[in-house]
């Protein structure tokens, strides 16, 4: 009966907006843990290379690093069961490696230049998940900060990075939100607050059953006079768009890159008794100028909505600013009277086309063959 209900619920939600969703109990914890700042596991990033688990990265401070695992180790056995040679599903492997805190998993490892398997008993524990991936002085006096998500620990990581960069002599900042699909709104609001004086509108929410709610800066920011640039792309979404929109509409800095994703729906999480969760859309996010961040959609037409990024690519939007169609009916003004446009997502002040000089198909084939890891 439970499975019947779980099979029927997605049909119900398909008639709602594209982001209202039901998450089964078995997936709910995983859906939330990336934003919580840590999870219980062994602390490795891995990939399936042909039919073997290849450790790509060992998370600093995690259980695997403490046990002695290294990048490019190959996991052959897990708890004495063979996982090499049978093309195991990546999701199954992940669930096997994760588990209750303080439980132990035995790994059989093949390491370069070691003739025999090495065995490690790894005690699962809290694995830190960083959301500020990197921060450094990119040029004299200019600090660069890459924020990959807006999680529970993001703001603290961010102000720590700012403090270190200031100590190194940085007086202006580049905030990189490319590929940042969002997270907690509060983290984005707190970050915006660092760059603005008191009384500036950051964002407001409004819905049919929810009256307008404005969020303002409180004047406690430590970088109120520091020049700032924000980097965005088509995968910058949700909280990334709140941050970018607030900076742009308040004329606090420049947005450089490409139009953002266009996800601006306020969702209310509803925890169900069996551990499953409903995320129900209740309102929309608006930038200070009044732009709705959410791109347009039609109820019940999720497939068209999901094709939006592909259609933007096909129309040349990632390669040429001229391919972006600006609608004068969606024209708004910043605090200083600059024109900005709505219609979904945040339009950059300076357009940068996608990088087409990256990885070649030949290089991809070499990596997939395993030749670089011999």
Report residues per predicted region.
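Residue-level recognition of conserved beta-strand edge/terminus positions
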Residues: 78-79, 110, 296, 343
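N-terminal activation segment of mature serine protease catalytic domains
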Residues: 1-21
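Polar, glycine-rich mid-to-C-terminal structural blocks
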Residues: 239, 251, 258, 262-330
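Peptidyl-prolyl cis-trans isomerase
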Residues: 2, 21, 112-117, 361-374
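PDZ/PDZ-like peptide-tail recognition elements
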Residues: 7, 19-57
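Cleft-lining beta-strand/loop regions that shape enzyme active-site pockets
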Residues: 1, 24, 54-57, 63-70, ...
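Conserved functional hotspot residues or short segments at active or partner-binding sites
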Residues: 292-293, 297-374
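Structural motif
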Residues: 72-74
